[in-house]
Amino acid sequence: MTTITDPGTEMTQPVRRVRVGLVFAVGLAAVTAIAAIHLTQGSSDVGLSDLLALLTGGGADETAAVLVASRLPRLVAGVLVGVALGFAGTILQSVARNPLAAPDTLGVDAGAYFAVVATTSLGISLPVIPSGAVAFVGGLVAAGIVLGLSSAGATGPTRLVLAGSALGMALFSASTFLLILDPEGTVGLYAWRAGNIAQTGFAGVARMAPLLVVALAACLFAGRRLDLLALGDDTATVLGLRVGRARASLIVLAVFLTACSVAIAGPLGFVGLAAPALVRLAVAHIPELNRHRMLLPLGALAGVLVVLAADVLLRAFLGGKYGVEVPTGVVTSIFGAAVLVWIASRHRDSGRTPPSPGAGAGVRSRRRFILVTTAAVGITVAAALVGMMGGDTWVLMGDLANWIEESASAGLMFVLDARLPRVLSALLAGAALAVAGTVVQGVTRNPLAEPGLLGISGGAGLGAVAVIIYLPGAGLWTVTVAAAIGALVAFAAVYALSARGGLGTDRLVLVGMGVWFGSMALITVILVMTDPWNLALALTWLSGSTYGRTLPQIVPILVALVTIFPLTIAGHRQLDIMALDEDTPRLLGEPLGRDRLLALVGAALLTAAAVSAIGVLGFVGLVAPHAARALVGGHHRRVLPVAALIGASLVSVADTVGRSVIAPGQIPAGLVTALIGAPYFLWLLWKTRAPDPG
């Protein structure tokens, strides 16, 4: 029997091979070109002509020494880290079926970093391979927690990113706490946190390379399992795949690759997110690349390209000196944040309307509201009194009374005069962030949202830090205005990008988180370039601190609260309506777009004022509104004042704890609020972890 074959079909296979080969050829050519440029850069005077002379046999010994001791190890480290994170990101996105899954968004980097810091703080000094094992355990535990809270990504990208970011913030805060407790024993780990491929010799990369090769081979061998998982759990099961076991083993492989990269260069931000995103651009035009035995090597090429290009751009723009001081991970984080914003801006919300933040809170009686408010006022007053009494030197109530009457000793007057601005700034900042968080949650209809997750806190911090660093003589109001401008610019960018194709609440949160990550990376660049690795300066603004505050410095936040809070209370009905769904405000004739914009602008201004007073604080705008709704119900007329009191108490207590635990040393209030708020946030995710229907 003769089989007639369509000539077009005969030509299809060679054409496909040519297209696939062309993609890999272009990728290899790009990596080769970037690597060649990379070798010509450095802090020494060795340039392209010296390297060419060395290749032709006429180079100097100094050139060879620089190449072998510094530049080649840095290049090899960049290649290994790029390959590892490219593979890891591709695997995690395929397993979770989520384009935003990556070592960063799953908390793997943060878990690995915390494990290494915790081990070092115990006085245990580990070489490269054991430190990689410690990082692997920490990263694996973090990934397991995030995937469990987000139902393995089945509930969509928003929950996955929220869970990973919350856990990451908590672990980084805990790591910073350990750094403060043992600054001498953990020296260098703060800088290592940002990720840097600089190496002194081949020792580190030589030890990790064999482990990476074995893990990469295992990933390629598992390519068919990844292809089957992409078909869906039911289809994969029918075809004989044990889905649970396959998914678990692949996650372990991805975490192992990430741990290896962390052991070599520290947590290099967002390479595992950006590399697969670049690959998907090629896959969209060349479907033949969709098989994982093609996707994985292509993801590795993209990862190497991202890492080396970031390092080349860093040293090209900043020169040899700052190219050494500013870590490569800062540039990859900025690029990765842009990729996150790009992906999020194209994200479509699920058809199901998110529940109102007040859903399930029930209706509370007026009597209960009065009792709760009275109790909250009492707790806030008590927190303020304890804040005045506590610190490196504890005083008694009688001493406090004497200070009020101005009859205390000179030493006591000095201590309490210095504490008053700190206590007031903590109270006011906590209240402002709580009100802002209540507004943000109502507008986005997301009980897990807060000002930081919309990029507002990051923008405000960036504006304030830029003025403080570059205009050291600037006055208080200049810093406040800069923080307000930064917050409004960040908010405007988030709002504009999220509004394309309809303002979806999921999209708003995802874009906001991208802006947050980008702004924090830019803050790191400013701090490093100005005063490299000044830990106190970095922690003051990145962790939130009341240290050194004076009474005039609380005036801006007081003005913001006195102005905006009554307006927010007056608009409680609009907030209640916006918190329901997209359609109800329109049916009632409410201008939804205008109301939403005004509410978020108010939240941005309150956040900016809080940042100018105390620095960047996280989770206050999440915990306080949620606790208030649980106590007094979902109506904003009641939620707003109670949330403000809870937020004020929370930050005041956090500040007092930070001033007392390791006195005379101090822990920034932001670290304490993160250590309190992050577990609460994760508990909320656990409560609502069930997958969306359909």
Task: State each model region's role.
Residues T2-G694:
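Alpha-helical transmembrane segments in inner-membrane proteins
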